Amino acid sequence: MNAPESPLVAPQLTQTSPSGIDVPVRVGADAVDPSRIGAPGEFPFTRGIFPDGYRGRLWTIRQYSGFGTAEESNERYRFLLDQGQTGLSVALDLPTQCGYDPIDPMARPEIGKVGVSLSNLSEAEILFKGIDLAAISTSFTINGTAAIVYAMYLAVADKLGVPRAKLTGTIQNDILKEYVARGTWIFPVRPSMRLIADTILFSNDATPRFNPISIAGAHVRDAGATAAEEMAYTLANGLAYVDDLKRRGGDIEKFAKRLSFFFYVHMDFFDEVAKLRAGRRLWARLMKERYAVADPKAQHFRFGVVCGGSSLVAAQPYNNIVRVAVETMAAVMGGAQSIFTCAFDEAFQIPTEFSAEIAVRTQQMIAYESGIARTVDPLGGSYFVEQHTDRMEASIEGIMREIDEYGGVVKAIEDGWLQARLAERALERKMRIDTGETVIVGQNHFRREDQKNEVGEVFRLDPNAANRVLEKYQRIRDTRDAAAVAKNLARLGKAAADERENLMPYLIDCCHAYATVGEMVATLKEQWGEFQEPVGL
Amino acid sequence: MKATTQDAATPLRGKRIVVAKPGLDGHDIGAKVIALALRDAGAEVIYTGLRKTPEHIARVAVDEGVDAVGLSILSGSHRELVAQVVQALKALDAGDIKVFVGGTIPADDVAALESLGVRGIYTSEQPLQEVVEKLARELG
């Protein structure tokens, strides 16, 4: 575990990719089996789900943003939309994500820190003020309280007179990976799965253009999983949701069209491209072969991508701009439907307007200057890329089999098996960085003792934001119709006890009555209890 | 981890350490990696799991008779939460238990945390061996 002897000595290029896949020096034409590849827009969609790639429609440029109060975040959203961003991505603070009202002692230190505080409908009204919800799509990184935030979005659309059917956007709503990494779980696994099925089944009818789930590998990836493991865990989780929805009587030809996915892209270019191409092909095959899905649209693997995350480092932070550019190219070559590029300072602070703008410009340069978006799947047919895609797919399938053999992903999570496995993997990754085997330029290789690690402009949260949130919270509690709140919460509690009910209409009623996120969560906890975290290492 | 003697490989042998996640931050992989590394270095590690109150963490530290508490915070709430844990330890007459912090800690906040009595601040880029060695020196 010693540091590299000289940080300026060039390391050897390895023969194995970070996903553990053998990478030959030379790959010949015999490595490619054209029958496995297919054409763009055709099964098995190795080359993308659309025949015209990005010519028909560019990916959505969607930057994750939100902090402090709804007023401040609304201002940042308008700034980003003015810069040519084409969708919103709402970052919510931890109290909102974990289901605590701002006044709760657990919530107080966290108000507005990692996202905006959204405790009730009155805050949503401020957050989306002056933004045309029928014209833009809005994505929410929300899981434990996803059903509640979705209900709040519908309620605010109702208030603004926007027809629900016109709403587009996404709620992450993927609780399984929260138990493994990221940690904003609230309820035990089974009632959480019910809540997710409720949102998907309700959304398919009420908001048919909305993605009621974004099954995410991003967080396990950032926590230590390889690209192959990220895809394998995500597909396994996806299948668990599919099985649950079928059990609830959902029509797979219908709900499968609105399942979407979400990944991190890190720095190993071909692992990433291969991961995305292999995942798309594997999902289509699973839909068609395992579930006999006939409609090609219900076989489509649509996904968003984040570039950056834990691949960004504090050492020489401006280098991160280049990392994000490389990663964005991999996301485009992999055929992403939406891309979020991290700002170069995002690994350690909320981005400033300066760094946030560079992140948007990076996508625009790749979209409109580089030319790589002109041709669909420009790497398709490359001897190496097709071979690496095949090997990646085999590796993903192998990991999925291991999970199956353990007893399925739900059991693996409830037992803490997957969590422990991920922690071991994270330790291995850290050791490889410490020894210099994994190269991070400017950190463990090619660094100088006197190098500059300052980020330049430092973002400062307004220290009074939390107090303003608390004042607004108290005001709404004092002015709302308390009897209507109590009545609607009671109806919600009763419906939660009955598995045949879909909870969405009850949650929307609660939101309209200005019930708070904390009140709705407390009502559901009374029925379902809380998740008991397995903490064994 | 290569080492010439047993002691060098396990410099934290005999030490008991709580690794804790105060507040609502769910990013626990750093805490788990540190917990595994400290365990491999010979320490007995008690990992609390997510979303623990400062009072709970202090209570566990006292009940388990630990030498040190490591707090992992990536949500930006480190100043408030560390102050609360330090306070909670003092309230239990356990102000002598040493407090360490890891996570996303801006350089500007280091002095503020040290003035609360924090004995070491670690970020994800620090090699684990360095973390272990520093900790071993601090805990004597």
Q: What residue ranges belong to the model's regions?
A:
Chain A
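A short glycine/serine-rich beta->alpha loop
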Residues: 136-142, 225-226, 268, 310-316, ...
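Conserved active-site and cofactor/substrate-binding residues in soluble primary-metabolism enzymes
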Residues: 40, 71-75, 83, 118-122, ...
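Flexible, glycine-rich loop/tail regions that form catalytic "lids" or insertion modules at the edges
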Residues: 6-33, 43-45, 94, 353, ...
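Catalytic alpha/beta active-site cores
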Residues: 1-266, 271, 290-293, 297-304, ...
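Short Asp/Glu-rich motifs
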Residues: 99-100, 176, 349-350, 422, ...
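Generic secondary-structure signature for well-ordered alpha-helical cores
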Residues: 86, 129-133, 155-163, 197-209, ...
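Active-site capping/gating regions of soluble enzymes
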Residues: 216, 232-241, 260-442
